């Protein structure tokens, strides 16, 4: 005799809510990619005396809706600029994207939702962000080009946004090979 499965479960169903226990900061950066977060943290560490406060978080720690809610209420609600780089687009972190968009519009927070894949833009992320497409493209170019100087430029752009300025800096092209 065969029994039909009447329920299903995914790996995300097994995720427990957690509290990241982060203090609020003016600038927030989130990504699923450790290399993104390490590059941003290193660039901030080199210029911390002249940049606004920064917190970074890995999105794998914010998969449970209760974790997202707690983090938004205790950390994101106090930010001036929030940058999120998403692998898989809006649907891979839908609840977080929607909650951040609502918060950003209510509080006037600069919100940049950027694609993590190799594509020029993501229409849904652009629509959900509070920044214009040209500013999102400038921020994304820093990740596309990569390297310490572009992570420093990214933080300068974020610092400007935290001060209410438009994004003016541009990513510096990095040679694909050689010097």
Describe the function of each predicted region:
Residues 1-179:
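An N-terminal assembly and electron-transfer interface module characteristic of large anaerobic redox
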């Amino acid at each position: 005799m065969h029994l039909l499965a009447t329920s299903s479960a995914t790996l995300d169903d097994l995720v427990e809510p957690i509290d990241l226990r982060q203090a609020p900061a003016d600038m927030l950066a989130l990504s699923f990619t450790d290399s993104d977060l390490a590059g941003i943290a290193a660039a901030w560490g080199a210029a911390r005396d002249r940049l606004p406060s920064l917190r970074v978080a890995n999105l794998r720690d914010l998969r449970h809706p209760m974790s997202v809610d707690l983090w938004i209420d205790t950390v994101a609600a106090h930010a001036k600029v929030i940058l999120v780089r998403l692998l898989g687009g809006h649907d891979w972190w839908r609840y977080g994207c929607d909650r951040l968009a609502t918060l950003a519009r209510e509080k006037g927070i600069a919100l940049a939702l950027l694609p993590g894949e190799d594509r020029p833009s993501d229409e849904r992320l652009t629509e959900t962000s509070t920044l214009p497409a040209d500013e999102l493209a400038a921020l994304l170019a820093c990740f596309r080009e990569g390297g310490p100087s572009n992570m420093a430029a990214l933080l300068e752009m974020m610092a400007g946004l935290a001060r209410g300025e438009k994004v003016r800096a541009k990513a510096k092209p990095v040679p694909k090979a050689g010097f």
